[in-house]
Curated annotation (Swiss-Prot):
InterPro entries: Creatin/AminoP/Spt16_N, Creatinase/aminopeptidase-like, PepQ_N, Pept_M24, Peptidase_M24B_aminopep-P_CS, X-Pro_dipept-like, X_Pro_dipept. GO terms for biological process: proteolysis. Pfam families: PepQ_N (PF21216), Peptidase_M24 (PF00557). PANTHER family: XAA-PRO AMINOPEPTIDASE 3, XAA-PRO DIPEPTIDASE. Gene3D superfamilies: Creatinase/methionine aminopeptidase superfamily, Creatinase/prolidase N-terminal domain. GO terms for molecular function: aminopeptidase activity; metal ion binding; metalloexopeptidase activity; phosphoric triester hydrolase activity; proline dipeptidase activity. This is Xaa-Pro dipeptidase. Mn(2+) 2 binds at D241, D252, E417.
Length: 443
């Protein structure tokens, strides 16, 4: 990783230099952030690092630290490492693979940073604590023009970032295997989640997003995170959407299983998996993401016809918008330091935004695919009352096989999701590549 990071920081130095020159700035100060206190409490929420800090300094536990960059000299990290007996004192990672790319200053008191900040009015501040920035003399605080430039750069990953996301596949896949086994052993959602965390060597505090561990109809809740503590004696289906992080970079993987491998629902899962690989094989640099989402909606329409859920032609099902009730989310999203990574709608460094079309309000990416973009491919098929009820009260209701839908509602839904990186010749499936290395893939 050392060589890849050297190339990564070299590229970012050039980006910073361009940002400073175009915005007439002499330097950039980035604060990593601090844990927030709960209201009227002395307990904090888990610390979540400023992604712009993590972009330059791949150490996501670096709380209350600072970076200074001028685009020319080696960046300086001001690492906060106080003496403490209440908590485990932070240890500066001065022997890490990235350490040689920085000048180091160790701070034992957070107030010390003030003496290092020279001429703050000629610099910009990026961070959450705007009051802190003002108290230190900054007047250019999170300027949108600077953020836009950073966000757009973040949407095109370096080889270091791609490797980190690839490495994050392994822990997640090990967790998925353990969760699958726990489901087929009849464990509860709570126990399945524990199995995932143990196998992936994570805790609920450092997973990239709240694990979605859903049995039966809970799969119809897209972001279900409640967890039943008691086993379900009539388990029919299991959906798990869970990832891991390496150096702050996330994986985001989803699988669905049928309790009865010979059921029609199991056949639907298999078909959705085939659609996933099929659409990944079609991904091409320069083509807009919306076109692939539209293709997926058309395939959902085909499934609704093929499995006799809707008694219209696939073309009619798509044109009438019926498929949207069964696939309400987007095909996927950019992936990186944030699970829903920056600049999914941003079309250029200036910040021009292209919102999703009205018919697909949940689409998270309206970009043309570009080389070294990392995205999720997230296909879904659900039985959600909130979306089906309007159809039941519409003129289209007579074309829908409500008896069969009622039979399938207890399954909740299907989601399957892999992580891919765009290359000049097409998409590279990072999840499948890791599955093959772990000898988990049968595709």
């Amino acid at each position: 990783m050392k060589q890849l990071f050297t190339q990564h920081i070299k590229r970012l130095q050039q980006v910073v230099q361009t940002i400073l020159e175009t915005n007439f700035l002499s330097g950039l100060w980035i604060h990593s952030g601090t844990a927030r206190y709960h209201f009227l409490d002395d307990q904090t929420a888990p610390f979540k690092i400023n992604p712009h800090f993590n972009y330059l300094f791949p150490f996501p536990t670096a709380e209350n630290c600072w970076l200074f960059l001028d685009g020319k000299n080696k960046p300086t990290v001001y690492f906060y490492a106080p003496n403490d007996y209440w908590h485990t004192p932070p240890v500066a990672p001065t022997d890490a693979f990235f350490a040689d790319e920085f000048q180091w200053v160790i701070l034992q008191d957070s107030q010390e940073i003030a003496k290092f900040i020279q001429n703050p009015t000629a610099c910009t501040f990026i961070g959450e604590d705007e009051n802190l920035a003002e108290s230190l003399g900054f007047n250019q605080i999170n300027p949108q023009k600077v953020l836009n430039q950073f966000h757009f750069e973040r949407s095109i990953k370096s080889e270091f970032e791609i490797e980190a996301i690839y490495q994050a596949q392994f822990a997640a896949l090990k967790g998925h295997q353990a969760a699958k086994q726990a489901f087929f052993e009849g464990k509860s959602e709570f126990e399945i989640n524990l199995a995932y965390l143990k196998a992936s060597q994570q805790s609920d505090l450092n997973v990239p997003y709240g694990n979605i561990v859903a049995i039966n109809q809970h799969s119809a809740i897209l972001h279900y995170t409640q967890l039943d503590y008691a086993p379900n004696p009539q388990q029919q289906s299991f959906l798990i959407d869970a990832g891991a992080t390496i150096h702050g970079y996330a994986s985001d993987i989803t699988r669905t299983y049928a309790a009865d491998p010979n059921s029609e629902f199991a056949a639907m899962i298999k078909q959705m998996e085939q659609y996933k690989y099929r659409i990944i094989d079609q991904l091409t640099v320069g083509v807009n993401y919306l076109s692939y989402h539209t293709q997926m909606q058309q395939w959902i329409a085909e499934m609704l016809y093929e499995y006799d859920f809707v008694r219209l032609t696939p073309e009619q099902i798509f044109e009438e918008g019926i498929s949207r009730a069964f696939l309400p989310h987007g095909l996927g999203h950019l992936l990186g330091l944030q699970v829903h990574d920056a600049a999914g709608f941003q079309q250029n460094p200036r910040g021009t935004r292209q919102s999703p079309p009205e018919v697909y309000p949940s689409l998270r990416c309206t970009r043309d695919l570009a080389e070294n973009m990392v995205l999720t491919m997230e296909l879904g098929f659900y039985f959600i009352d909130m979306l089906l009820n309007p159809l039941q009260n519409s003129p289209l209701a007579r074309h829908i096989n409500w008896h069969k839908i009622a039979e399938f509602k207890p399954f909740g839904g299907i989601r399957t999701e892999d992580n891919i990186v765009m290359r000049s010749q097409g998409a590279e499936n990072l999840t499948q590549k890791a599955e093959i290395e772990l000898q988990l893939s049968d595709h």
